Amino acid sequence: MGTNDALTSTEDAVTAGANDAPLPAPPEPPRKARRATSRTSDFRVAEQPAYVLHSYPYRETSLIIDVLTRDHGRLALVAKGAKRPHSALRGVLQTFQPLLLSWSGKSEVRTLTGAEWVGGMLPLGGDGLLCGFYANELLVKFCAREDPQPPLFNHYVLTLTRLAHGEPAVQVLRSFERVLLRETGYAMALNRTVARRAVEPDRRYVFDPERGVRNADDEVPSHWPVISGQTLLDMEQDDYHRAQTVAQSKTLMRFLLNTYLGGTPLATRQILIDLQNL
């Protein structure tokens, strides 16, 4: 499958890895995202399952790493000395690899005290790598700091595993996007309308970003994409074997993600557009 068909919500592309060109500074999460309390405490956490989403230089020899952890949500950690040539952290703090991280501190940016590579994850390549960078960017933009979301963490691991094994990127990404929206407060059923009527496969609908599925015959903004009932039912079941469902689900998710991000562009999308223009 080609990259154009695989990547969604902006036809994404490769973005920076853990030690490559940085992503833009993460914006505030969308307004519906659940926010953790502002309380911080001086504590130590040992051997927490985690993945590096992104990193950027800090001072001369260190890195700030943006990580997704299983039980503590998304965090920023300072990895002191990680840029030094002989640092043991250089080869460990890589994206898409399962880690056990330890940290301490009471500030918003905690101090990394240990990092262990767990292993067992196949490396991503080709379209799978592009999709992985796309998933990381969505997590950075949608997830509030210190908001534990174990189901989202587990689905992220599943997403990487499926991509590494070469499963169709279209289905893998659509599934990830829906879980991401659900866990960050945007979940709405696709099999029932806002009037609580069952979606019919032969009818035409639109998706109101604030309310859910509505009849296409209603008075709605013209830029809302029209989606068949069959596509909505297929998406509810995570079924993407129909060509129409593949095309319409991509259009719908692009529209919803763009709306919830307030029109903020994704770096992965622009990189792919630039590559296609070569």
Curated annotation (Swiss-Prot):
SUPFAM superfamilies for the chain: ArfGap/RecO-like zinc finger, Nucleic acid-binding proteins
Q: Where is this region: Disordered?
A: 1-42
Q: Does the keyword DNA repair apply?
A: yes
Question: Does the keyword Hydrolase feature in the UniProt annotation?
Answer: no
Biological process terms from the Gene Ontology for this record are: DNA recombination; double-strand break repair
Q: Give me the segments passing through the membrane.
A: none
One Pfam family for this entry, by name? RecO_C
Q: From start to end residue, where is composition biased (Polar residues)?
A: 1-12
Q: Which InterPro entries match?
A: ARFGAP/RecO, DNA_rep/recomb_RecO_N, NA-bd_OB-fold, RecO, RecO_C
What domain of life is recorded for the organism?
Answer: Bacteria
GO CC, alphabetical: bacterial nucleoid
Keywords, alphabetical:
DNA damage, DNA recombination, DNA repair
Q: Which family does the UniProt entry place this protein in?
A: Belongs to the RecO family.
Known function:
Involved in DNA repair and RecF pathway recombination.
Q: Which PANTHER family match?
A: DNA REPAIR PROTEIN RECO
**What protein name does the entry list?**
DNA repair protein RecO
The organism of origin for this protein? Burkholderia lata (strain ATCC 17760 / DSM 23089 / LMG 22485 / NCIMB 9086 / R18194 / 383)
